Every structure is written in structure tokens, then in C-alpha cells.
Amino acid sequence: MFNPANQTHFSLSLDGLRHDLQVLEFSGHEGISRPYRFELELVSERAGLDLEALMHRPAFLAFTPQGQGVHGLVYGAAQGDAGKRLTRYRLTLVPHLAYLAQRNNQRIFQHLTVPQIVALILEEHGILADAYRFQLGTRYPEREYCVQYDESDLHFVQRLCAEEGIHFHFRHSAEAHLLVFGDDQTVFPRLGRPTAYVHDSGLVADEPVIKRFSLRLASRTTRTTRRDYDFEKPRLLLEAGNRPAADAPAEPDLEDYDYPGRFVDRQRGKLLSQRALERHRADRRLGEGVSDQPLLVSGHFLEIAEHPRAEWNDLWLLSEVFHEGKQPQVLEENVTSDTSASTDDFQQGYRNRFLATPWEVFFRPPLEHPKPRVLGSQTAVVTGPPGEEIHCDRYGRVRVQFHWDREGQGDDKSSCWLRVASGWAGNGYGGIVIPRVGMEVLVDFLEGDPDQPLVSGCVYHAAHPVPYELPANQTRSVFKSLSSPGGDGYNELRIEDRKGQEQIFVHAQRDWDENIEHDQKIRVGHERHDTVEANSYSEFKAEEHHTVHGERKVELKADDHLTVGDSQHVKLGRAYLARAGREIHLKAGQKMVIEADSELTVKAGGSFIRLDASGIAISGPLARINAGGAPGSGSGIAIKMPLTPGAADADVAGRPLQPANAGLHASDPKQNGEYRFDIRLQDIPGDEGFPLIHTPWRIVQGKEHNLVLEGESDEKGRLVLDDTQQRQLSNACERAPGDVWLVYPGQRIGIRPHREREGWDATRHALGALDFHDTLGGQRAPTPLEHQRGKLDSCCEGDLYSHLLAKD
């Protein structure tokens, strides 16, 4: 057909190697988004070729004397039968990409797009920038976390490309082959000239032709729907779909619905659902043909001409090509086997079989490389930045180092953020315990997806033993924490269930705060022992009742101060016995009555006065009545008032859960933020006031003046509040808006928080320059500079600049 029958059509060249190998026959299969593979049968007059020297060598198989053919690397070599003069050899020719199938890996990629991941892997295999090309029409998002898990590099690359709808094909020359990635039809080149269709009549045509061509139609999915869930936008319905154009032929409604769709915004979901539909329908119309045209290469457009069905005379995208060639004329003698062992009448020349789709139908690689699934759970170690003992984000997520991850550095970049499962999680309530750096945790994977890890628990190991030795303490249930940073302290709740030794043990390393909104009832079946190392403060807003059924023994090592606002009533069943080492001084503002039913005695210095039913007896060396002298005096009272107890640490209640309605798009409820207070004590309000330094102050709440905070101002008159105190004051203002008061000498001022916008001071000066006080409903301030921030904020409901323009 191309050359006389006794001339060879096919030839093999090996880079950097002189040889006498001749192509006896070959077969090959190539397709879009898959490495090609050609099996070559060769003969040589040399019976001892060095097979190792052939391996991995670039080679070019020419189909025609003009140089059309396939370039690749020698992937396999074998020596076959030997005759008197010729020895058979077999070579396998593949692209460089095929070598990726021989390297399996488990690794993590973070914040990279699919093209970036693919390029990284290619260059690790020596496929450099001049050997591959990306011709993409779409910008692909970064994958925050992408795992290659127990799969070959080739499987991983093909899987990622198929998930995104990216295809690849090869372009060949005698010196190299080029790997081209694309995502639309424009990336596919067109073959040089049309190829005529000539029905296979058994005759040999003058030019390469298409001998057979058929078209089949198949039922395929007609619409796709994808849905996903984003925990950062839990009330947002993430769903996207795609269907054929309205003018497409009517077909049954066949939907492909999938969850999770692996997207976090609708635009991305729309693209993925569109690519999925294009993938389903890529081969709905599939052409199949047979030809002897050696120019056919997958990933190229073939133009068919002279077909009796006119609409088929068009461009067709070659998706797969099966090549076959034989040239028995290279044999100059018989060897053990010959080339006639064929099941058909093809004995010599070149032929191919191909699959093709219409040019306007987008090609998308099928999902033939499923994502590996993680079977069961794994363990990992919690990681963080150097020096950090606890590392988490606003959701309590942590990072981990997987045992299989060879590239991770065990730091705050070793994985994505992993959510931590809790036994209870509500809207501002529930339970949370953050796994700490160094802890070994149990990791599950949502639907077995290695890209979606989730911490489900913690486990002990030899280097991190349990709090109490086991099994000696197997009856103990313990929750024990560790002070951070640095350790050297702990909080603990321990429950001992050993028979006869049952116990609940609580240890607080520093403070213990309790808030009980209603009653507290405590019953102690035996003894109770309280030891307070420093002061004890109690305040009862109503009555206090004590009943002691036995004796009461109280010892005070220093003074006892008792202040009773009204009357004190003391009832003694038998006797009142009091002894003072030096003095007893009783003083009444108006009168004092000492009454005894039978006898009253006053005794001092050997003298006494006794009053009883028989009369009054006065006994002493000398009795003076109205004879001068003066009464003795007492020391007088020097009462000290008690300090009020500090308030227990407070928090805000959670909020009821609101079920999400399917199909609705609602925003997240606004979270209540904490105020940050900046308070200064002054003799008068406003910029003209002088700061009151080192002045005691109290912040109280409600009519009963419940103490919230107290302290002393600093050298600038400011209230120095730490984070805990800021939170306590913020919570008090949220619980009782408008009923929280700052009290200091001569002042009682309501605390009414407002949000201070950035740049407020500059805005305030602008308001003063425009005499903004006139807008306060005619209530002019006593001094022009007096602070009215709360009022000004309420006046300006919109943009301050717009408000100024309106006033001007």
C-alpha cells in the first residue's frame, strides 16, 4: 500500500544506541487520560543483546517512512527464540507518565490546586516543564487538604484530574513526547487532512482510508445534582444541579444525585455538577471505526470525508485507538514461530480500530480511579507550634501528625484543622475538652474519606500513662487536667467506687467558683471539716438560720466584731457565763435594764451590791452616796465592718437550637460579643474632669447592690481590669442592662456599654466643630466637651459621614 511488499514500513530508533533491531510486528493501545502501551516484536542478528542497556531508553516507533509514529521509553525487554541467524526480542514502549504507576505513596498536600499537585509529582519523576503543558480555561481552587492515601502516583494524578474534569493526551515527535493537560475541546489538535471513508471491499486503496465506521446511541444520565454541608455555614443549603439545554432532544428524567459533593460554595458546586453531567454524556454518541490511516492518535480531531451519511462528514475526537502492524518480510529464515498464527486474514501492513465522539461534545475522563477509603480508625499525635502546649482554633479544632506521614514535621502545619467530637454540643452549651499537643488521639474519617479526618477520642500509651496505676485503681473514674503552660498543677474530679471506700474527690488548683440560681441543699451523713487558709467571706441577702442540736464550740484567736442593724435577741436555756480577761463595757444609747427574777449582784474589788427579795445589800469598806467622785469609763466600741464576698465567675447561657429548614438559605445567628471596658474615675464627667488616682471603687448590680467587682484606680485614675474581670463585667451588663453601677466617693454612675467605632475621636472632634450638640433634642450639655458618646451613638443610626452631610 505505502511501499513495495518487500520493503519495511515500520522502524524503531533507540536514543544513543546503534542496533540492528527490526520490527516484526507490534500492537498498541492509547486513549485520552491514560498512558499508552505498545508491545513490539523485533528480530536481530545479535543473539546476545544487553537487555539492561535497553531498559528505560527513549525510543521512537515509526509507522511510516515519513516519520509518523509513537515516542516512549522502553518499559520492558525480553529475549525470545533464536534461529540460525535471527533472534527475537520483545520490547514494551510506554510514556514517561506510566512510571508513576510503580511508586505508591501516602502523603499530604495542603493549599495547592490540582494542577500544582500534578506538576509537583511530575517533576519528582523527572518529567520537567518542557515535557508537559497545562492549557486550562478554568481557574481551579486550592484544596485546603488533599491526601494521597495508599495509591500509586499515577492513580492519584488520574483521580485528581477526573474529579476536576481535566483530561490529558500526548503529542509525539521522533525526539520526545509531550504531555498536554486541558479542560475543553480547544486543546485537542486537528490531524493534517481529511481521511476518506471507503467501504471495506477487500481491495487495497491508494491512500489510507476509513474502511468501516458506525455510530451508536446510548441512554445516559440527563441531569446531575450535588449537595454538601459546610459546618462553618450550617444553615446554608449547599446544593447545585445541571441539566441539558432546553432545546436538547426529549429524554427520560434520569438524575445522578450525590452527597457529599465536595464543595463549600454554590459556584464550585455548579461547576462540579456540570462536569459530572458532561462526563455522563461524553460517550452518549460514540463512533467506532476501522482504518489503515497511521496518523490517527488519541486526543486529536479526525475529519471524515466522503461518507454517504453527510452529517458524519465532520470532525470526530479520537478517544481511543488500537494499533496493529506486521511486516513478516524482515524474516529471512523461519524461527520457532511465525506471524501467521492470527485468527483473521491480517498478515501484513498496518491497521487500527478507533473510538470517537462528536467534536462539540465535551470530553471528560470517566471516574475509573476511585478515591481510596480508610477502613476504620487511625491514631495520630496532636501537634502545634514550638513551645505551645495547647493549640486550637475558634472551633476547638486541632492539628495532628499521622504515623504514616513521612513528610510532616510535627508542627502546626502537619495537617489540616481536625474537628473534635464531643459527647454533647449545642448552641453555646455542651461539653468540650481540647486535646493537647503530644496527646495520641483516635481519628475517624467521614465516609472513610482521607480528606475529611475527625478526632473522636484520645488514647493513652506507654509514654503517657494513666493518672493512677492500673489495675490497682481500677475502681476509680477520673477527670484530671494539667495546668498550662508549664504543668505543676492540676484540677481533678475523682470517683472511687471500691466497696467500703466510696469517695468523690475534687481538687481545684486555684479558684473554685459556684453559681446556683435557686436552692442548694447539702446533707452530710457524718462529720464535716472545713479549713480555710486565709479569710472567709459570707453574705446573706435575706435571713440566715442555724440550728445546732449539740454543743457549739467557737474559738477566735483575735477580735470578734458583730454589727446588728436593729435588735439582737439571745435566749439561753440555763445560764449566760461570760469572762473577759480585762474589761466588759456595755453602753446603751438611751437606757439599759438589767433584770433578774430573784437576785442581782454587782461585785468589784471586795465590795458588792446585791438586790434580792429581801432588799438591797451594799457591802464595802466605805459607801459613798452623793459624796463626789466620778464614774469609771470603758474603752468604747471600735467596730469594723465586714468586707463583702467577691462574686463567683459567671458565664452566659446557651441558646436553643433552631432546626434548619430544607431548601432555605438563612444566615447564622449573631453571636453575642464581649464588651471591652475602658473606665476612668474623674471628679466631674467629661474632658475637663481631673482623674482620681488610687481611689477605691465598686461596681454593683441591682437594687440590692450586689457586688460585681471592686478595686482601686491606678496612677492615671483608670480601672485596671484583667480578662476575667472584663468578662465578669460584660456578663453583668448583659444580664442586667441599665442596672449596673460604678460607685466611688461622691459618685454613683450607671454603666451603659456602647460599641466605640474605629476613628471615634476624630469623628467626635468633627462633631464638636459643627456644634453637633444641637441635634440632641435641645438638651445642650453643661460643658461643650462633656462626653455624650452613648447619646451620639443613638442619634447616628446610619453612617456618621452621611449624618454630618445632612446636618450641613
Swiss-Prot record:
Keywords: Secreted. Belongs to the VgrG protein family. This is Type VI secretion system spike protein VgrG4b. NCBIfam families: vgr_GE, VI_Rhs_Vgr. The gene is vgrG4b. InterPro entries: Gp5/Vgr_OB, Gp5_Vgr_C, T6SS_RhsGE_Vgr_subset, T6SS_Vgr_RhsGE, T6SS_VgrG/RHS, Vgr_OB-fold_dom_sf. The keyword Glycoprotein does not apply. Part of the H2 type VI secretion system (H2-T6SS) specialized secretion system, which delivers several virulence factors in both prokaryotic and eukaryotic cells during infection. Allows the delivery of the phospholipase effector PldA to target cells where it exerts its toxicity. The lineage of its organism: Bacteria, Pseudomonadati, Pseudomonadota, Gammaproteobacteria, Pseudomonadales. It comes from Pseudomonas aeruginosa (strain ATCC 15692 / DSM 22644 / CIP 104116 / JCM 14847 / LMG 12228 / 1C / PRS 101 / PAO1). It is found in: Secreted. GO terms for cellular component: extracellular region; type VI protein secretion system complex. GO terms for biological process: protein secretion by the type VI secretion system. Disruption phenotype: Deletion leads to a complete loss of PldA secretion. The keyword Secreted applies.
